[in-house]
Design a protein with these regions (language model features):
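Active-site-proximal loop and beta-strand segments within enzyme catalytic domains
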Residues: 2-5, 15, 19-26, 32-33, ...
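Acidic-leg catalytic submotif of subtilisin-like serine proteases
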Residues: 180
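Catalytic loop of the DD-peptidase/beta-lactamase superfamily, centered on the K-T-G motif
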Residues: 2-40, 166, 173, 210-630
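Short, surface-exposed recognition loops and adjoining beta-strand edges that mediate ligand/DNA contacts
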Residues: 184-195, 260
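Stable alpha-helical elements in mature extracytoplasmic
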Residues: 10, 75, 94, 98, ...
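ABC transporter nucleotide-binding domains
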Residues: 205-206
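Short glycine/serine- and small hydrophobic-enriched flexible loop segments
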Residues: 65-70, 157-162, 230-237, 315
Length: 630
């Protein structure tokens, strides 16, 4: 195939994706042997900056490894050797080594979000992450299991600053951006020039303003597809790391002491999401991949060291997978420019455990599932605040897996559920055909079975039936419309000792409920501990929650606060007029926590006569004026 025909094929793939998902903006870059061989842009120019999210972790990883090469850091050394202010109140914390920050096995909760995703810079976020780590127990033993963790890379960012004596941005600029001539990469430390970056769609009336991901080392860098490939070129050529160090970075490091990782697609290297993707392995190719996503942006990058090949996609859209687009583009280019021979690869699937162990309640970080037997089939149900809903009828196929009669299982087409045992636990493993090659099976450890137990009378039961609102988020935080602001603690019959939010926690004692899930990937990620303050107040992770029953009523008048934190009110009357002055913000929630109105992103209150809760946030010299209907 000629080069022109190959480029035409790549154009067709990009245009189809753009039209199918109504993409606001996208950029693609492909490099081969240190040369840009293909680009595609829609809704953006070559130098338009995208928020590339967790691709920032690759730069953080390279920065740590450069310090290792300089003899300033040891990968097997305890993190506290370099972060003197880190004092995690957990007897297991001494096992936390530098390398564990890079392969997601650090055991941290991973949910330090306060002030992280904002419309303004928060220069204290790193200090807040360390302060949070110093308040709570670890989620798991360091080195036990590689469960995706943003907080590990925030600590790596702090380590870079502590060891180098420079800010993270200064070190990355001097050690990576300048040597790689990455002229279109920046940090969320200042206002970017209008027209040089993209505004993501908010889902309300107005687009989001500039995004500030204040956890820069875990996901805050702005860049372009071209700059990402340029970075990878220099990495592959040995301009940033010695070959042996790069080989170490590109090696699978995912911890597997929980015994289930063999059936997980979480094949982490240092920084990388995947270093052994079967989609490429079947052609004898070793691809290292990293994706990224923030509110309104998503991205994906691929590096093939032996072939000196890199490919990057940056998107501004709420739809479509940058991973699948990038993988399709990479294979389309490689298949036309070099001889590829497809060979079968090991596609091992988990062996079903004893069927008598299948029934029960399973949990992951965003929900609870119940599997029960009925006559000649199984039923899978979802927990919704203590009520089992959305029953799905399943039956076993010839391989011993559960499949849905509807053809769709847990919103995945042609999926299987395999129930397998490891380390005395039973897990749900979701198996789906790869969208680009149906002969390949993708595997995700989806949920872990809870252990039944008799109910114990504890003060935690006093929380049942009550609603709690998160009341200490920051004025310019972007996540109000994206993360749950409400929690409804409840207990499950027959499962004493577990306190359920959207996911279960184990009632460690009368003051603390802790994580109970341990398996690799993302479905056991971002789970904090719950601390009892009193019956009306809780702390989950780093956030304070207040019982809705204890909230004051919203009344007419002027509201003035100076702390830039959200204050919640119950609403019993509809609005006649609402006015925000200065750096003030008002948010209305319905009883399920859905955002009905946000004064930053909406022109006026739409179709809302009476909401359930109002949040008022402001700093100095600001005011919110409320006038209610009689």
């Amino acid at each position: 195939m000629t080069a022109g025909v190959c480029m035409e094929k790549l154009d067709q793939i990009c245009k189809k994706f753009e039209e199918t998902y109504q993409v606001k903006a996208m950029a693609v870059s492909i490099h081969h042997h240190d040369r840009c061989v293909y680009t595609y842009h829609a809704g953006a120019k070559a130098d338009t900056l995208f928020s590339v999210g967790s691709i920032s972790k690759i730069m953080t990883t390279v920065a740590v490894l450069k310090l290792v090469e300089q003899g300033k850091v040891e990968l097997d050394a305890p993190v506290t050797r370099y972060l003197k202010e880190l004092h995690i109140p957990d007897e297991r914390a001494g096992k936390l080594c530098v390398s564990m920050l890079l392969d997601h096995s650090c055991g941290l909760a991973g949910n330090c979000y306060q002030g992280k995703y904002g419309n303004a810079v928060n220069r204290r976020h790193l200090q807040q992450c360390i302060a949070y780590a110093n308040q709570v127990r670890l989620k798991d033993t360091p080195g036990m299991c590689s469960t995706y963790c943003n907080d590990g890379f925030s600590l790596a960012e702090a380590l870079i600053e502590a060891v180098s004596g420079q800010t993270y941005a200064q070190f990355i600029t001097e050690e990576i951006l300048r040597p790689c001539e990455m002229k279109h990469t920046d940090f969320p430390l200042h206002s970017l020039q209008e027209g040089k970056f993209l505004h993501a769609d908010s889902g309300f009336d107005f687009d989001y303003p500039q995004e500030y991901v204040n956890g820069i080392g875990s996901g805050g860098i702005y860049s372009t597809a071209e700059d990402i490939c340029r970075f990878f070129d220099h990495l592959m050529q040995g301009n940033l790391l010695h070959p042996a160090t790069l080989a170490l970075m590109n090696t699978k490091h995912a911890a597997d002491h929980c015994g289930i990782s063999a059936y997980s697609d979480a094949r982490y290297g240092f920084g990388w999401d995947d270093v052994e993707n079967p989609l490429f392995c079947q052609y004898g190719l070793t691809a290292c991949e990293k994706s990224g996503g923030t509110f309104g942006f998503s991205s994906h990058s691929i590096l093939l060291l032996k072939e000196q090949f890199s490919c990057a996609v940056t998107l501004c859209t709420q739809k479509g997978s940058p991973t699948l687009l990038n993988e399709e583009l990479a294979l389309a280019y490689l298949s036309e420019t070099m001889p590829l021979v497809k060979r079968p690869v090991s596609n091992s699937l988990p062996k079903p455990c004893d069927m008598r162990k299948w029934e029960g309640v399973y949990a992951y970080n965003k929900g609870l599932l119940r599997l029960r037997k009925e006559m000649d089939h199984y039923v899978l149900e979802l927990d919704e605040n203590g009520t089992w809903v959305r029953a799905e009828k399943l039956h076993t196929d010839r391989s011993g897996a559960l499949v849905s009669e509807s053809g769709s299982l847990l919103r995945h087409h042609d999926a299987q559920l395999r129930l397998t045992a490891a380390d005395a636990h039973v897990y749900m493993v979701l198996v789906t055909p790869h969208p680009l090659d149906s002969a390949l099976k993708r595997r995700f450890v989806y949920a872990e079975q809870l252990i039944p137990g008799e109910a114990k009378k504890t003060k935690w039961q006093q929380l049942d039936g009550h609603l709690y609102l998160q009341d200490d988020e920051w004025l310019f935080q972007r996540k109000f419309a994206h993360q749950p602001l409400l929690i409804r603690p409840h207990h499950l019959e027959g499962y004493g000792g577990y306190l359920c939010l959207t996911h279960p926690l184990w009632e460690q004692n009368e003051r603390e409920a802790v994580n109970t899930l341990r398996f690799p990937g993302t479905n056991a990620a971002e789970i904090g501990n719950l601390l009892w303050i009193n019956e009306k107040e809780l702390q989950y992770g780093m956030y304070h929650y207040r019982c809705a029953d204890a909230l004051p009523l919203l009344e007419e008048g002027e509201y003035r606060f100076r702390d830039a934190k959200v204050h919640w009110y119950r609403i019993t009357a509809s609005f006649e007029q609402l006015t925000c002055y200065g750096n003030a913000r008002m948010i209305l929630l319905d009883e399920k926590g859905n955002v009905l109105f946000d004064s930053i992103y909406m022109n006026g209150i739409h179709d809302v006569e009476t909401a359930c809760y109002a949040g008022i946030i402001m700093d100095e010299k600001a005011m919110v004026k409320v006038q209610l209907h009689g």
